[in-house]
């Protein structure tokens, strides 16, 4: 109920996106109702969801400058599994919200958040048999929490020459995975993995309309934190690591249409670096890309793209330490992916189309 548009890009990603190699899935959220309150309740076989939206600070105005969307979902799988006699108890909550505020005719503020709480546990079944015993011994205990919050300020220039967007956000993942000798009483740890990932980001994008060109440029700045604590009592392995570093990048992109909008051209680049790895710099991750799209007949388009993309290694690799406690992968290169794509698209209606796409993607410096 939040989503107004979804776009999947399997190549020719916008230069503003850092770290994708194979695809970008972009969600566009709608705004809440600015005139009245609406409620929606959905019930399925596994969960129930509640959505609420409406205006804030409306007063006597017909339309408020501020609106909100709030959705909460709760599972009742644990009750269902108990009813049918299974010892496992999956349990989850998730939520998302959006607040939109119109400051004036040229400035808007958006606050977006989403998160989840997942827990997986076991209980002694009413009928204890070999199958139930095997399930109890093998079932892990999982506790996972995710949270993302972002604030975006969008400013349109009064001379209609463009706009700018500034976004500050944080996303955090906490994951605890445990196996017990006595799962029912949660006693006697066999294995436990406790991991945390947190990213705090600042992104600025300036979009200008220069003649028939649309030019976007900007930068991103990110603080990355990762920690992992592992206990393996079976093999007497005890492992801990923690890293904290800055990642940054710059980008630019220019688009224009020619021949009465029959030919669309897009060219761009981005460069990325960080304070953790030692074998990379901005020039080493220079990633150009170009895209062409031509309408050769009514409702028919052929397109071609070529581009290079980079992605930093996963935190589990960057944070790995040897038996002496030294970080061994600071010399990791960014993974590189070169894309060559040719596609054909037919528009069935203003809101529907069908496309056929062929691509060649070559990866290098892939961590194994």
Give the ranges of each region predicted by the language model:
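N-terminal periplasmic accessory domains that precede
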Residues: 1, 8-11, 16-39, 50, ...
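Outer-membrane beta-barrel channels and translocator barrels
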Residues: 3, 34, 46, 57-63, ...
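Transmembrane beta-strands of outer-membrane beta-barrel pores
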Residues: 10-12, 29-31, 43-47, 56, ...
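Residues that define the transmembrane beta-barrel architecture of outer-membrane proteins
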Residues: 19-21, 44-48, 91-93, 143-147, ...
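Membrane-embedded beta-strand positions of outer-membrane beta-barrel proteins
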Residues: 39-43, 68-72, 111-113, 164-168, ...
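Transmembrane beta-barrel wall of Gram-negative outer-membrane proteins
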Residues: 44-76, 85-119, 141-164
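Face-selective signature of the C-terminal outer-membrane beta-barrel domain
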Residues: 100-118, 140-280, 295, 355-356
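Surface-exposed extracellular loop regions of Gram-negative outer-membrane beta-barrel proteins
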Residues: 125-132, 174, 227-230, 280, ...
């Amino acid at each position: 109920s939040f989503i107004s548009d979804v776009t999947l890009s399997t190549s020719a990603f916008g230069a503003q996106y850092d770290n994708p190699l194979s695809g970008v899935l972009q969600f566009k959220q709608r705004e809440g109702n600015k005139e009245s309150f609406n409620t929606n309740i959905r019930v399925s076989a596994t969960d129930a969801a509640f959505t609420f939206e409406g205006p804030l600070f409306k007063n006597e105005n017909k339309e408020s400058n501020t609106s909100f969307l709030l959705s909460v979902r709760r599972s009742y799988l644990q009750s269902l599994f108990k009813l049918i006699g299974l010892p496992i108890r999956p349990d989850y909550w998730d939520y998302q919200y959006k607040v939109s505020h119109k400051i004036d005719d040229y400035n808007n503020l958006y606050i977006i958040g989403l998160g989840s709480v997942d827990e997986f546990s076991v209980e002694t079944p009413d009928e204890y048999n070999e199958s139930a015993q095997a399930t109890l011994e093998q079932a892990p205990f999982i506790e996972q929490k995710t949270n993302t919050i972002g604030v975006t300020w969008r400013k349109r220039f009064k001379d209609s020459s463009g706009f700018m967007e500034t976004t500050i956000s944080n996303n955090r993942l906490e994951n605890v995975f445990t196996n017990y000798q006595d799962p029912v009483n949660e006693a006697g740890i066999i294995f436990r993995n406790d991991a945390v990932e947190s990213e705090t980001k600042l992104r600025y994008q300036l979009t200008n309309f220069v003649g028939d060109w649309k030019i976007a440029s900007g930068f991103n700045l990110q603080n990355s934190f990762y920690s992992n604590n592992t206990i393996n009592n079976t093999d007497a392995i005890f492992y801990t690591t923690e890293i904290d570093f800055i990642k940054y990048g710059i980008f630019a992109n220019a688009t224009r249409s020619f021949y009465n909008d029959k030919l669309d051209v897009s060219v761009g680049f981005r460069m990325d670096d960080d304070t953790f790895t030692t074998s990379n710099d901005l020039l080493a991750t220079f990633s150009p890309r170009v895209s062409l799209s031509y309408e050769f007949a009514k409702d028919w388009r052929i397109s071609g793209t070529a581009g290079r993309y980079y992605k930093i290694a996963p935190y589990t690799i960057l944070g790995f330490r040897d038996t002496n406690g030294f970080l061994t992968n600071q010399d990791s290169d960014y993974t590189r992916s070169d894309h060559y794509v040719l596609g054909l698209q037919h528009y069935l209606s203003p809101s529907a189309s069908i496309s056929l796409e062929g691509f060649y993607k070559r990866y290098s410096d892939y961590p194994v």
